[in-house]
Regions:
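Regulatory N- and C-terminal appendages and interdomain linkers associated
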Residues: 1-80, 294-466
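Conserved ATP-binding subdomain of kinase catalytic cores across diverse folds
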Residues: 34-37, 43-54, 62-224, 268-270, ...
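ATP-dependent phospho-/nucleotidyl transfer catalytic cores
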Residues: 136, 166-257, 268-356
């Protein structure tokens, strides 16, 4: 059984103040013609002490952006650069969002409330700073499904429809508008460090390293790691652990993010910013999510490679502070860390106890053969073979020594897994777009959360000690 987030008192803690002078710009939210509450995360609002807000108060804070008590007096648009499809872009930053508030959750973690679609900023360039309502709905679906599947992800905290007609090239237009608030474990990206390196702000680079170590604490590097006492090296090891686990969690979930640019890499290892995402309809390493990913750079099977490449850019960004050798040593841990995370997470989703990397790898290889030859998607495969049921041949033999986990939840006997394939996503959106019927979406969220209960507690994301 999976536990709900631990409730908490509202505890504001604006740690970003320590680095805001070089990391952010104060901005103002757009004024919208209407504010209709469409989604409120009733699991996570309690975890940050905001569950007692009335809907009217909710809209005032998350649709009109009146500051929360004792929190940031003005929103902050964060500065960063990034490699986008491996082309360096120095002209980006928070172009349609900002950091709105920071507070502690029931476990004592510092969490951020950030926005998407809240208006223009100094980094909007020619864009309008808005989010389509469909984009907001897709964020709900992606984050709820990923959280259920054990991925370390941001949470969609609020969606408010804002009453504007938007023109978009990738949606039938005009289309409805929204503003989203996400709950995230930080908003510091690899691209945040890249910008400081590009501008040769080495003192600020060191300040940001210290901020991340203090704000998002993690374990020390291995005893034999060169340079392990250097702050930048400690952070490099922690981020490598976190992102290796993220790569594995995407693969086990059968999820394709679509735009794994360095500005979309959170140093806490948390997945966020969901645009053209897709789930696999069948096991296919070459499957892509984004129509504009014509070379397959961010295809399903290349996601670990993409994330490791991004870590290489992180190492380069830290190079003004330390020598290359200890950074390379940290980066070289990615492969083994990824393999171990794959084994741990694959066994968890399959409903068997891990027996160590060697035995687990045999299960993974046999499972991939079954999915590939049977043209099965991960959702169907993991559901059919939960705890070893229905396994035949090499898969049955590979799983025979693994202890099955609990399959008593009635979800496992209903005959059909929850999934998030594109046809269902479009059907859910059509109900909203054509009839303003939100019931199918809310019902889907309920079913996803029920699946999470059946799956039980997911493996803990590594690289954190607080």
């Amino acid at each position: 059984m999976r536990h709900d987030p631990q409730p908490a008192e509202y505890t504001p803690d604006t740690r970003i103040d320590a680095v805001a002078d070089f990391l952010a710009d104060p901005v103002r939210a757009a004024e919208f013609p209407q504010a209709t509450l469409r989604f409120r995360n009733d699991r996570w609002d309690k975890a940050v002490g905001l569950g007692s807000l009335s809907d009217e108060e909710w809209v005032r804070h998350f649709g009109r952006f009146d500051p929360l008590p004792d929190n940031l007096p003005q929103p902050l648009a964060l500065r960063y650069h990034g490699h986008q499809f491996r082309n360096y872009n120095p002209e980006i930053g928070d172009g349609r969002g900002f950091l709105f508030a920071q507070m502690r959750d029931g476990a004592g973690r510092l969490l951020d409330l950030g926005t998407k679609g809240s208006g223009t900023t100094p980094y909007s360039r020619t864009a309008d700073g808005r989010l389509t309502l469909k984009g907001g709905v897709r964020e709900i679906l992606a984050t709820e499904m990923l959280e259920a599947l054990g991925v370390n992800t941001s949470r969609t905290f609020s969606i408010i429809e804002t009453g504007e007609a938007l023109e978009r090239g990738d949606e039938p237009s005009p289309t409805r508008s929204a503003v989203m608030v996400r709950l995230s474990h930080g908003h510091i990206r690899i691209g945040s460090f890249q910008r400081l390196m590009a501008f040769e702000e080495n003192d600020n680079l060191a300040r940001l390293v210290d901020y991340c170590l203090a704000t998002y604490p993690g374990p020390p590097p291995p005893e034999d790691a060169p340079g392990r006492d250097e702050p930048a090296i400690r952070l490099m090891h922690q981020v490598t652990e976190r992102l290796a686990d993220l790569a594995a969690s995407y693969m086990v979930a059968g999820f394709v993010h679509g735009v794994l640019n360095t500005d979309n890499m959170n140093i806490t290892g948390e997945s966020f910013d969901y645009g053209p995402w897709r789930w696999l309809p069948a096991w296919d390493p070459g499957f892509t999510a984004a129509y504009f990913d014509q070379t397959g750079l961010y295809a399903f099977g290349r996601q670990p490679e993409a994330i490791r490449w991004n870590l290489g850019q992180f190492a380069i960004a830290l190079r003004p502070l330390v020598e290359a050798e200890p950074l390379i040593a940290a980066l070289e841990r990615f492969g083994p860390l990824f393999q171990n995370a794959m084994a741990r997470r694959f066994c968890w989703r399959l409903g068997i106890a891990s027996r160590g990397l060697e035995a687990d790898a045999v299960v993974i290889n046999a499972a991939e053969v079954v999915m590939r030859e049977g043209k099965l998607g991960p959702d169907e495969f993991f559901y059919r073979h939960r705890g070893g049921r229905g396994a035949q041949g090499a898969l049955r033999e590979a799983m025979s020594g693994h202890e099955p986990l609990d399959t008593s939840h009635e979800y496992w006997s209903e005959g059909q897994p929850e999934s998030m394939l594109i046809d269902e996503v479009e059907t859910l959106w059509s109900a909203i777009d054509e009839r303003d019927d939100w019931t199918p979406l809310y019902d889907k969220v309920t079913r996803i959360r029920r699946m999470a209960q059946a799956l039980g507690e997911a493996p803990a994301a590594p690289g954190h000690t607080g």
